[in-house]
């Protein structure tokens, strides 16, 4: 009887942990695929950390006021394999990011594509469960 209780408790705990991990890695938990956004601005900082990279950028709104935005990218390993390094985006670099807004309305977005000043484009690699499948991610093909 005691063993049965321990097994049931352990199984329930594993289910809860699995749900939390799944929610963390779910695009749909944080970002809205129905709210695409294009941000033009300058890089203020890059966080080259696991599990996601973050590009911070200064973006001018319609009134000319500067807003700070945080763009979630893929893992450093994914971006390295696509040719981006932690020194590829020095502070002050002008970039364009296409992505999807945060559901909570904050100045955060999931980055889909990054366009450099010379016109080169890079898939930021931050897709995941619930992310729109638009064919730009080469792993979708």
Task: Give a label for each model feature.
Residues 1-11:
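Bacterial N-terminal signal peptides that target proteins for export
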Residues 22-37:
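Short boundary/loop segments of OB/S1/cold-shock single-stranded nucleic-acid-binding domains
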Residues 81-97:
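Short nucleic-acid-contacting surface segments enriched for D/E, G, S/T with interspersed K/R
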Residues 9-19:
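Bacterial N-terminal signal peptides
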Residues 102-126:
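OB-fold/S1-family single-stranded nucleic acid-binding modules
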Residues 49-59:
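Short aromatic-glycine-enriched beta-strand elements
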Residues 41-43, 94:
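Conserved hydrophobic positions within beta-strands
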Residues 120-141:
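Extended, charge-rich, solvent-exposed interface segments
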């Amino acid at each position: 009887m005691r063993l049965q209780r321990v097994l049931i408790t352990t199984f329930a705990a594993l289910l809860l942990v699995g749900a939390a991990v799944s929610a963390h890695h779910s695009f749909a938990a944080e970002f809205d695929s129905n709210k695409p956004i294009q941000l033009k601005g300058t890089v203020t900082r890059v966080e080259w950390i696991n599990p996601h990279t973050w590009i911070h950028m200064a973006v001018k709104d319609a009134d000319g006021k500067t807003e700070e935005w945080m763009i979630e990218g893929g893992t450093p390993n994914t971006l390295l394999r696509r040719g981006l390094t932690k020194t590829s985006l020095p502070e002050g670099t002008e970039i364009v990011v296409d992505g999807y807004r945060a559901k909570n309305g904050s100045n955060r977005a999931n980055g889909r594509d990054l366009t450099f000043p010379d016109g080169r484009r890079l898939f930021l690699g931050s897709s995941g469960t619930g992310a729109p499948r638009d064919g730009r991610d080469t792993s979708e093909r």
